[in-house]
Amino acid sequence: LFYLNNFRMLLTLFSSCSKNTNSADTIVFNANVWTGDENQKTAQAFAIKGDEILDIGTDEAMQQYKGSNTKMIDAEGKFITPGFIDAHMHLMRSGEMLLNVQLRDAKSPEEFTQRIADFSKTIDAETWITGGSWDQTQWGGEMPRKDWIDGVTPNKPVVVMRMDGHMLLANSAALKIAGVDKNTADIAGGEIIRDANGEPTGLLKDNAMNLLLDIIPAWSEKRKHEILKAASQHLLENGVTSVTDMEGLHPSFQSYETADQLRTANELNIRIYEGAALGDFAKVNKADYKNDKWVKFGLVKGFVDGSLGSRTAAFKYDYSDAPGNKGM
């Protein structure tokens, strides 16, 4: 309902909008506008005042809203649509990945290693290397190991996530700080991947990831603002104006708190529908969270297994490429 109301109010262009004799701040004309209204699917122009659309229609009809200070934008026939909504994302995690090492399109183990080596040179010795979003299918399916990156990051801790968020790779420096070794027991709902000698390979799945994630130094308030702004800007550049965020109360990300701070400072430029993990949802009912057209709580997230790419989704039978593994 939150999305629908705001979509209608701010983005969907309705031909039934009442006429407003006030001058518009902006008029967009000579456009190919998709309205989302079954009664008038397309239009040429629309008028905007503040954060609301005054009217939509023909170029000629919008002239009634033109004032001495109205900004006129010629769309040159381009297609215009209401902003897109991302219905499931991890907002702060996404912003963090934009500002850290990029591994999503690494095409080989060598490129994977080189990107981490290059990024390592751009940060100080105390900074953890995070981000990643790697995908082993880009180079044939072999899972990465800590020895891929230990040589280029002997002293800097590295924790890079797989693209689905259900598995990470840590180097030896990070594992040592976390106290994870061959004697570390597996975590319920998670797994430490080990070699033939029982030594961790650097891969940790689902709940076992918390052994590393929980010890990564907390972000400063300034850094959190930078991360959320980076994510927001990337979304807007791709036409996304509203998101459903799955980690509103996550202690490491603090998405709601950060969004609220930016909203108060008038620096929030996307709408966020916040969700809470199943274990945190009681906090939403007890705390005095503000809910308005910019930030609102409204969902709870829980899951029972994992993902296909990380081989953690639960099946009755073994994975075809991982004998003995039925998931978690």
What does each model-found stretch correspond to?
Residues 1-7:
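Bacterial N-terminal signal peptides that target proteins for export
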Residues 289:
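Polybasic (Lys/Arg-rich)
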Residues 13-16:
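C-terminal motif of bacterial Sec signal peptides marking the signal peptidase cleavage site
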Residues 19-29, 34, 38-284, 302-328:
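Divalent metal-binding segments
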